[in-house]
Amino acid sequence: MMNLGSLSLSTSKSSKPMVSISFWIPYFTHWGESLLVCGSAPGLGSGNVKKGLLLKPSQQDDQLIWSGSVSVPPGFSSDYCYYVVDDSKSVLRSEFGMKRKLVVPETLTGGESVHLRDLWQSGDQALPFRSAFKDVIFHHSFDVKVEKPLGVFMNKSDQDDSVVVQFKICCPDIGEGTSVYVLGTPEKLGNWKVENGLRLNYVDDSIWEADCLIPKADFPIKYRYCKVQKEDSIGFESGGNRELSLHSIGSKQEYIVMSDGLFRAMPWRGAGVAVPMFSVRSEDDVGVGEFLDLKLLVDWAVDSGLHLVQLLPVNDTSVHKMWWDSYPYSSLSVFALHPLYLRVQALSERLPEDIKEEIQKAKNQLDKNDVDYEATMETKLSIAKKIFDIEKDQTLNSSTFQKFFSENEGWLKPYAAFCFLRDFFETSDHSQWGTFSDYTDDKLEKLISKDNLHYNTICFHYYIQYHLHVQLSAAAEYARKKGVVLKGDLPIGVDRNSVDTWVYRNLFRMNTSTGAPPDYFDKNGQNWGFPTYNWEEMSKDNYAWWRARLTQMGKYFTAYRIDHILGFFRIWELPAHAMTGLVGKFRPSIPLSQEELEKEGIWDFDRLSKPYIQKKFLEEKFGDFWPFIASNFLNETQKDMYEFKEDCNTEKKIVAKLKSLAEKSLLLENEDKVRRDVFDILRNVVLIKDPEDARKFYPRFNIEDTSSFQDLDDHSKNVLKRLYYDYYFQRQEDLWRKNALKTLPALLNSSNMLACGEDLGLIPSCVHPVMQELGLVGLRIQRMPSESDVKFGIPSNYDYMTVCAPSCHDCSTLRAWWEEDEERRQQYFKEVIGVDGIPPSQCIPEITHFILRQHVEAPSMWAIFPLQDMMALKEEYTTRPATEETINDPTNPKHYWRYRVHVTLDSLLKDTDLKSTIKNLVSSSGRSVPANVSGEDINKSRGEVIANGSTKPNP
C-alpha cells in the first residue's frame, strides 16, 4: 500500500546516506481533487503522472497546504511539476510555464533535509515566458550573464540553531545594470537596509537566487524583493511583506528553498495596431500589402509608441481562383502562406529589364482604391513564373531551399500536389478528382515524382512558398529586433475543399458546417461553411495536426488571436445542406431526450420538429403571391396545412429551385426577398431532431420568435421555454468547461506564442473562468459589452487579462459607427463622453482622441487599435467616406475583403504629428513604449512585469 505523501529511492541493501526532499505548496482544491508532484526522474514518476508522489493536505491558518517527501541521493536532479488529479490519478489541471528544476548539490553528504516551498504557477504567471515577452519585449532580461549554477547552496547548514534559506524570484523585466536584492527583518537580510541586504545571483531563465544562514530564533521573518539600479535607485516590489515561518523543522541540517514566483510590480501594459496584411499600402507593393511592408509598419509602430502589430490570417485561401478567395479565414492550407503577399521584385537580384518594366507597369495599374484580388493574383503569379523559369535551378539547388524543404515537406508536398490537381480538374472539390479523391502517401509520391511532365509545376509551388517563408521570416525577425510583437490570427476552421480535409479527412465531420448562433454580428446567425472538427479522432494522436499547425505559426509570430475561441468549448454545428446559421445545435451538448420531453407532457414530435406551415401564415408573408409559393415548394397535407416538397426541403434545395424558376422567368418577385421568406417558413420549427439519433432533440434558437411556438398551448409553451433556457444556459456548462480544458491546452502547449482569445458573442458562463485559469487573454470591444445590462463597455472596468479596442475587423470603424445611428450617438455622447447637447454628426479628431484615451488608460494588458481608428486622430485622413473603411460585413457570406488604406506607409512614416499624438497617448497612460532606433530607454517605468496572478493592475 502506498505511503501517502512520502517516497524513498533507497533499497534495503543500500546504505548510502539520503537527502530528504519535502514538497510544500498552498492550493485550494474541490471535493474529490488531490495534488500530486511528478518529475522526470524515477523517484518522481519518470514523467508518468500515475506514478508521481501524491501529496497530503493540511489546514494551516487560512491556507490549504499540500505536502509530501521523497528521499534521494546527493547529486539527484529532476524536472517536476504539480498536478491536480482525481481519485484515479487522472489529471484535471496542471501548472503552466516552464517545468521546475530540482538539483540536489553533490556537496550535501546525506542526512540533510531540503524543504521546497513552492507556489502554484497559474496561466497568467507563465505569460512572461511566452515569446511575445521573453523574445521581444523583455528579451534584455533573458540575456543577463549567468552568475551561478541553479540550485547550488552557497552556505552550509552546519549549525543546529540556524537554517539555510534560499530565496528565489522570477524577474522577467530587468534593466541593464540592475541588481535584485531581498531585504527583511533578520540581520542576514539587512534589517531592511539595502546596503546590508542579500544580493541575488542570476541563474538563467530570468530566475534570481541566493541563500543565507538565518538563526531559528529570528523566525518568523518578513521580507520583500527589490531592484537596485546603478544610481542606487531602489524599486521595491508591490504588495505586502512576504513571510516565512518554521512549521516542522527538526534537528537535521535544514535547507529551505523559497520559490516566490514573480516579482510583484505594476502590471506591464502595451499598445498595438491592427490592420489586415492586404490593406497595407506602400510605394513598393504591387496591388496589395506584402510581407516585406511589415518592416515599414514596424518602424511606424515603434515611432508611434506601439509594441504590437496584429494581422488577419495570412495562409493561402486559393480555393475558388476568384475574388471569393479574398476571405482570409477559409484556408486552402493551414500551413501554406498566401502568394498574394509575395514581393515579386525581391525574388531575384538579377531581374531582366523587361520583367522590371512589367512589375512597374503592374504597380501602376493595380494602385487602386481597393484591392483587385483577381488581377493582383494573376499578375503576381505570372511574373513569379517568369522569374522562376530563370532562377529555378539555382534556387532549388541552394542549401537554404534544401533546408526549408526538409523542414516543411510534410505539408509542402501535399500542398503542391493539391494545387496541381485543383488546376488540372478545375475545381478544389477533391471529391471530384476520381482516383485522387482518396489521398494516400503512395499516390502523393507518384504525383510529385521528378519523372512527371508536370514536375516543373510542382516545383513552382515549392518555389513560391519558399520565398514567402523567406520574406515573412525577414519581416518577423525585424519586428523582434525592434521590440515589436507580431500577432497572427488562427482561424476556427478550414475550407471544406482544402489540403487538410483531403489529407486528414478523418479529422473533420464533412457532413456538417461550422457557424455561430445569432448575436451582435448577425441576428440570423452565421454559417461559415467549414466542416466541424472530429475532436475524438484528433485526441488519438494527442492533437498532432494542431501541434504542427501552431508550431508552423510560431516560426513567424510571437502572439496569436484564437478566432472564435468559443468553438473550443462548443461549436455551433449545422447540417451541410444549411446555408444560414439559425437552425443549428451545439456540439458537444446534452440534448433533450424523447423520454425527458414525454415526462413533461410533450408528445407530438412531428408537430414540433417539422416546419409548421399554415395557409394563414403564407397569406401573411407572401400576400397574393402565396399560391405560387405553395404550388412550387409545398404539398398540402390536410386542409390549410402544408409541408415542403422533397426537392426543396433544405436551404440549398430552395436556392436551387429559385434559380431554376428565375431562369424560366417564372419568378416575378425579388429573388433575395423570396429566398429569405421561404427560409423563414423552413425554419419555423420548435425542436431540431438529431440526425444521428431520432430520439434526441435540440431547441431551435430564439424559439419564442416562431409562429410554431406561438401557436402552442400554454402548458407546452411553459415547458419548452424552461427546457430552452436549461439547454442554452445551464445544463451544458460543466461539459463545455471540461471540453475546453482538453482541447485548449493542446494549442497552448504547442508553441510559445502569447495566446489571445476572441471571446465575443453568446458567452457561456464557463468561458471566462477557464480562460483565466489557462492564462488566455480575452477581447473587449466597447460597443459589444460582455455585460447584458449595459449598452457600452466601460474600459476602466476591464480585467487586466484582456485586449481592449473600440472596434475590430468584424464591425464598422469608429468613424462609421459614429455616423450610423443618431440615437446611439446621442446616448454615447451623453453617457460616456459626459456632454449634454447635440453631438457632431461626424467623429471628429477630438472625439476619436477621447475614445482612444479611454482605452489606453484601461487596465487591459493590451490596447490594440485598427489603423483606421488611429488615422481618425487627424482630419486630413478622414476625407475618405467612413463606410469604405469597413473590412468585413459578417451579415454577407460573400463579402469582398478588399479594403486598402488610402495612405502609404511611406507617407505615414513622415507624419511626425500623428506619430507624436499616438505616442503621447500611449506613454501618458503608463503603457510601455518600445525603444527608438537611437536606443533610448524602452520606457520610464522600468521594472514592470506581467500581473502576478492579478486580473487588474495593483493600485
Swiss-Prot record:
Regulation: Inactivated in response to cold stress.
Disulfide-bonded cysteines: none
GO CC terms: cytosol
EC assignment: 2.4.1.25
Chain coiled-coil ranges: none
InterPro entries recorded: Carb-bd-like_fold, CBM20, CBM20_DPE2_1, CBM20_DPE2_2, Glyco_hydro_77, Glycoside_hydrolase_SF, Ig-like_fold
Positions of transmembrane segments: none
Traits of the deletion mutant: Dwarf plants with yellowish leaves that accumulate large amounts of maltose. Increased tolerance to cold.
Induction: Circadian-regulation with a peak in expression in the middle of the light period.
The keyword Cytoplasm appears for this protein: yes
Residue segments, region Disordered: 925-955
Name of the top EC class for this enzyme: transferase
UniProt keywords, alphabetically: Acetylation, Carbohydrate metabolism, Cytoplasm, Glycosyltransferase, Repeat, Transferase
Record-linked CDD domains: CBM20_DPE2_repeat1, CBM20_DPE2_repeat2
Residues carrying N-acetylmethionine: M1
Location of the CBM20 domain: 13-122, 157-270
A single GO BP: polysaccharide metabolic process
One Pfam family in the UniProt entry: Glyco_hydro_77
Similarity-based family: Belongs to the disproportionating enzyme family.
Function recorded in the entry: Cytosolic alpha-glucanotransferase essential for the cytosolic metabolism of maltose, an intermediate on the pathway by which starch is converted to sucrose in leaves at night. Metabolizes maltose exported from the chloroplast and is specific for beta-maltose. May play a role in freezing tolerance. Temperature drop induces inactivation of DPE2 that leads to rapid accumulation of maltose, a solute that protects cells from freezing damage.
Name under which the protein is recorded: 4-alpha-glucanotransferase DPE2
Species lineage: Eukaryota, Viridiplantae, Streptophyta, Embryophyta, Tracheophyta
